[in-house]
């Protein structure tokens, strides 16, 4: 059973997050291992496994990029284990330049420049994310896979920049 079916939701990117949260809470109550403490060992094991599946489904569906990757997996694209990489040389060069810029910001401990950098990366991410949403709506799975690969780069870059921000603020 796929995660969308488990939560009683349609298998699409745009989700009712409130319905997702409510269904998660319902499933957690229904399959919580403590409810099966007096049951047989097999029932206890099944409850633990079901609870783990529910938690994994929740984590996957609540995070937009993970949800997109999961949707791709349902359409035959396993980005988690694939050997395909981004082939867009201009994009890769841009990523290298952004990484170098982030390194320079770190060396200079320039908080103002870092703030501007984070905003720029967020805008780049948001633009690509919107493109991905359109591609998902059109079910152009190859294009979605390519965009998700690029979003991964931007997500890691954003995370690195935010970690640097925390580091600089701690001084």
Swiss-Prot record:
PROSITE patterns: DNAJ_2 (PS50076). The keyword Ion transport does not apply. Residues 2-74 form the J domain. InterPro entries: DnaJ_domain (IPR001623), HscB (IPR004640), HscB_C_sf (IPR036386), HscB_oligo_C (IPR009073), J_dom_sf (IPR036869). GO terms for molecular function: ATPase activator activity; protein-folding chaperone binding. It comes from the Bacteria. GO terms for cellular component: iron-sulfur cluster transfer complex. Keywords: Chaperone. GO terms for biological process: [2Fe-2S] cluster assembly; protein complex oligomerization; protein folding. SMART domains: DnaJ (SM00271). The keyword tRNA processing does not apply. Pfam families: HSCB_C. Belongs to the HscB family. Co-chaperone involved in the maturation of iron-sulfur cluster-containing proteins. Seems to help targeting proteins to be folded toward HscA. Interacts with HscA and stimulates its ATPase activity. Interacts with IscU. NCBIfam families: hscB, PRK05014.1. This is Co-chaperone protein HscB. The gene is hscB.
């Amino acid at each position: 059973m796929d995660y969308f079916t488990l939560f009683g939701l349609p298998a699409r990117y745009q989700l009712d997050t409130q319905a997702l949260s409510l269904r998660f809470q319902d499933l957690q109550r229904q399959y919580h291992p403590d409810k099966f403490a007096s049951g047989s060992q097999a029932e206890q094991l099944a409850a633990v496994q079901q609870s783990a599946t529910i938690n994994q489904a929740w984590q996957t569906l609540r995070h937009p990029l993970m949800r997109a990757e999961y949707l791709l997996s349902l359409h035959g694209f396993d980005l988690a284990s694939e050997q395909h990489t981004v082939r867009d040389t201009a994009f890769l060069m841009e990523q290298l330049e952004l990484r170098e810029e982030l390194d320079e910001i770190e060396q200079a401990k320039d908080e103002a420049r870092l703030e501007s950098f984070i905003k720029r990366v967020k805008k780049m991410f948001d633009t690509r994310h919107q493109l991905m949403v359109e591609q998902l709506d059109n079910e152009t799975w190859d294009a979605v896979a390519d965009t998700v690969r690029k979003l991964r780069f931007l997500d890691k870059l954003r995370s690195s920049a935010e970690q640097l921000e925390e580091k600089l603020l701690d001084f």
